[in-house]
From Swiss-Prot:
It comes from Rhodopirellula baltica (strain DSM 10527 / NCIMB 13988 / SH1). Belongs to the DNA polymerase type-Y family. PROSITE patterns: UMUC. Monomer. GO terms for biological process: DNA-templated DNA replication; error-prone translesion synthesis; SOS response. The record marks Y11 as: Substrate discrimination. This is DNA polymerase IV. The gene is dinB. Its cofactor is Mg(2+). CDD domains: PolY_Pol_IV_kappa. Transmembrane segments: none annotated. Mg(2+) binds at D6, D100. PANTHER family: DNA POLYMERASE KAPPA, DNA REPAIR POLYMERASE UMUC / TRANSFERASE FAMILY MEMBER.
Length: 396
């Protein structure tokens, strides 16, 4: 069985824990004084319509009496490591998705720690007892079902879906609960008469593929409880990535370049925070028909430079577009071949590092500002179009 454990409003919950006077109040991390965007919002703040990626000025208008606090990303990372250490007490098979969520496969530790339900309860209680933080747990035989279960249980929830209860659990849910279905996809499916997951499950596979192509096959598999993905151990240790599925398919190169710029910044920042260098850059590219492609390039020298990562990613995008000019549903950038950033480096003989030093200073300043004001408080001009669109249509 697989557990999906997701910390509830993680950044905001940490602030409420550390400052008892904030408990029970609407707390907004980032976006203070109307600058930048909201990084996280407590559930009390969400009742006023505030959510992550919202402009701070909008959040203030929605809830003027909210407590706006500056983000402390290094502190959140430290707390996240403590959460992950608790996960590893119950199973070595842990796949972190971010600081505040992970998949856990507990199939091999049942004899040691009890049933999956007992393990899930113990994990949640241990996090509450040792870290004084709330977490939601979903348990299911499939990864995507465990994720849905934890989402449905939020906040501070616990939902278990037995192996023989997957169909009963999924059938009444809206199609938007399926992985890969955004607002545009939901509208398209509803227009075709598919409102619940059961509507997709009972549809003939060939008929669905004729309507929706490979995307239809993907949805049919999920609706019928078919998900062959395994929990991947040490996912973040082997690579760092960032990707976005678009509310509307993109086709113009200007918009795609803006997304690549945004993804490069976010991925490079995570790389530097982890004190790693990357020697491989991979661009992931999903077409409107759900076919997915990727192109990778190995670097001669490992890097953590945003500019270097961006330049390679843009070149990979141009190569991909020349082969695959159709509209794009998803773009992603992942960094692999990671090495320790603190390890000794080969020095240049003739001073070529001057430009690298300038780029490094820009990255350091950008990271410092992001830590103080939120990750969207400063970004490259080339990212502007995507950040504006993202803030207008945020992902909750």
């Amino acid at each position: 069985m697989i557990l999906h454990v997701d910390m509830d409003a993680f950044y905001a919950s940490v602030e409420q824990r550390d400052r008892p006077e904030l408990r029970g109040r609407p707390v907004v991390v980032g976006g203070s004084e109307g600058r930048g965007v909201v990084t996280a919002a407590s559930y009390e703040a969400r009742e006023y319509g505030i959510h992550s990626a919202m402009p701070g000025s909008r959040a203030i208008k929605l809830c003027p009496h909210a407590d706006f606090v500056r983000g402390r990303l290094d502190h959140y990372a430290s707390v996240g490591r403590a959460v992950r250490e608790i996960f590893h007490r119950f199973t070595p098979v842990v796949q972190p998705l971010s600081l505040d969520e992970a998949f856990l496969d507990v199939s091999g530790t049942i004899r040691l720690h009890g049933s999956p339900r007992e393990i899930g309860i113990n994990i949640r209680e241990t996090i509450r007892r040792e870290l004084d933080l709330p977490a939601s747990v979903g348990i299911a035989p499939l990864k995507f079902v465990a994720k849905i279960a934890s989402d449905i249980g939020k906040p501070n929830g616990f939902v278990e879906v037995p192996a023989d209860g997957v169909r009963e659990f999924l059938d009444p849910l809206p199609v938007s609960r399926l992985w890969g279905v955004g607002k545009v996809g939901q509208t398209k499916l509803q227009r075709l008469g598919y409102r619940t997951i059961a509507d997709l499950r009972v549809k003939d596979l060939d008929a669905l593929k004729s309507q929706l192509g490979r995307w239809g096959e993907h949805l049919w598999n999920l609706a019928n409880g078919i998900d062959r993905r395994q929990v991947v151990v040490d996912h973040l240790a082997k690579g760092i990535g960032h990707e976005r599925t678009f509310a509307e398919d993109l086709s113009d190169i200007e918009s795609l370049n803006a997304v690549v710029s945004y993804l490069s910044e976010q991925t490079a920042r995570r790389l530097r925070r982890a004190r790693r260098l990357a020697s491989t850059i991979t661009l992931k590219y999903r077409r409107e028909d759900f076919q997915t492609f990727s192109r990778a390039r190995k670097l001669s020298t490992p890097t953590d430079s945003t500019l270097e990562i961006l330049q390679v990613a843009e070149e990979l995008l141009l190569e991909m577009r020349s082969r695959e000019p159709r509209s794009v549903r998803l773009l992603g950038i992942s960094l692999g071949g990671l090495t320790d950033a603190d390890a000794p480096k080969q020095l240049h003989l003739f001073g070529e590092e001057t430009g690298e030093n300038a780029s490094s200073k820009v990255d350091t300043l950008s990271d410092q500002i992001a830590t103080k004001l939120g990750k969207h408080s400063l970004y490259r001009a080339s990212s502007h179009q995507w950040v504006d669109r993202k803030n207008t249509k945020p992902k909750n």
